[in-house]
Amino acid sequence: MAVKKNRISKIPSEVLERFKDPRQFFKFLKVFDKQSNALVPFQLHDEQEALLDALLEHNRIVILKARQIGCSTLVRAYFLWKAFMSSEPTRHAIISYSRDSADHLHSIDKEFYLSLPKPLQRKLSKSSARTLRLGDTGAELRSFTASGKAGATRSFAFSSAHLSEFAFFPDQSDLLANVMASAGEGQIIIETTPNNVGDLYHEIILGSPGNDWHLCFFPWYEHGSYTKKSQFHQPQIPDMSAEEIKLMKDHNLTKGQMWWRRSQISS
């Protein structure tokens, strides 16, 4: 029997062996930090660690999350790792609700690739607004939009697909059916903040895990940055309502978290 040749070029086999653990690969990535306005090492926080564990274990994942906790960034790093480690011309899709959103997520792919040390930046055969393709294996990251022409994904086969802000898709049922047909047994990740009660996304969450979707739930109060210095003691600030007091006790929240919550609701 012929031995299958590894087509990944220029990367020593011991490095590829090390990179079988995506956390080792992530150590070489950098991400843009809004606070410092600079690229910083990509270090996983607790929610991202939990999500990565789920990505490595499950094939159908639905994520229920608060905003700005880094889930989409983690999935983009994970997809770059999948493409990087593949020795075949696999296609990994990012599908978002608008062209601007899809382009932004694809720009994260490019930023991650360009942040790699030069010896790890394998030659690209294509780098465009929608596609990043490795020249040696043909593995690629490609972006699509859910608001474009109906069935735009039908012409493509996917090894994996990331559906970002799925709750805001104009036709969740049709697009998910297309993606599942295109991906076959490949991995599908639904990642979004909630939008409407009773939509397909809501149904998938309520049906998990019996519907073969693994739910990753990341509530806002578990994210360390979602807190503020409490202002409840100020003379002009209304005290916490009975509902707020109950919520704080039920979920073991701090006054700082409750003040953050109130400020978000009022804004």
For each of these PLM feature ranges, what is it?
Residues 2-267:
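Phosphate/NTP-binding elements of NTP-utilizing enzymes
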